[in-house]
C-alpha cells in the first residue's frame, strides 16, 4: 500500500532530523524548474505565487539561495502545515517511521514525487500555479505522466489523500487496472455533507499516522479508522472512493 498527500506551504529546515535524508527522484527537473524561477524578477515571482509582499520577500530569498548541493530536510519533517502536524512524524515509533518511509509519497510542484524522507529545501511552487513554466503550459503539462509512472511502477494499491489540485497530476493517466482509492472526510453543514478544508487536512494526517502504525494495512484497516469522530459510510462510498463522515 502507498499513500499520497499534498505538500504544505509552510516549511521548516532541520539540520538534525530524526532520519537521514534520501535522494530525490527528479534532480534534473528540479534544476530546470528552479532555473526558470531564478530567471524571473521578484515582481514576476510574486505574480506566479499570488502571495503577500512579506511572503514574496521570504520566498524570493529562498529561490536565490536554492542549491541542490545543500543537504535538505526529510520531506515529512520539512512541511509544517496542519496535515503534517496531525501526522506527527516526529513522535512516531521507530517501526512507524520505517513504515512511513516505505509507504508515504508527497506530490510537489517543484520536486514532482517525493518519498517521505527525500531531502528537500524550502521553496514555494504550487502544482496549480498559473502560467507557463520551463517551456510548458503549466506544471501539469511539465510533469506529464512521469509522476503517475513513478507511483504505479510497482503496481501497489495507492490511497489518495491529496487535494484535487495535486491528485490531478495523477488522475488523467489512471487505467482500469490501477488500484486507486480516494478518501474523503466530510461533515454536515446546513443539512448537507461537505468537505471542510482544514478539518480534512487534519483527518488526512491522522489517517496517514494510523496506517503507518499498522504493519500490514488493508482496505479493511482504512474502513476501521475512527480518529476524530469520523466513521466510514458504506452507503456513500464506492470501490474507488471511501467517504468518512464526522459524528
Curated annotation (Swiss-Prot):
Source species? Limosilactobacillus fermentum (strain NBRC 3956 / LMG 18251)
Please state what the protein is called: UPF0246 protein LAF_1150
In which family does this protein belong, per the annotation?
Belongs to the UPF0246 family.
InterPro entries given for it? YaaA (IPR005583)
Q: Which Pfam families match?
A: H2O2_YaaD
Lineage, opening ranks: Bacteria, Bacillati, Bacillota, Bacilli, Lactobacillales
Give the UniProt record's GO annotations in the biological process aspect: response to hydroperoxide
Q: Which NCBIfam families match?
A: PRK02101.1-4
**UniProt GO cellular component terms:** cytosol
| Coiled coil location | none
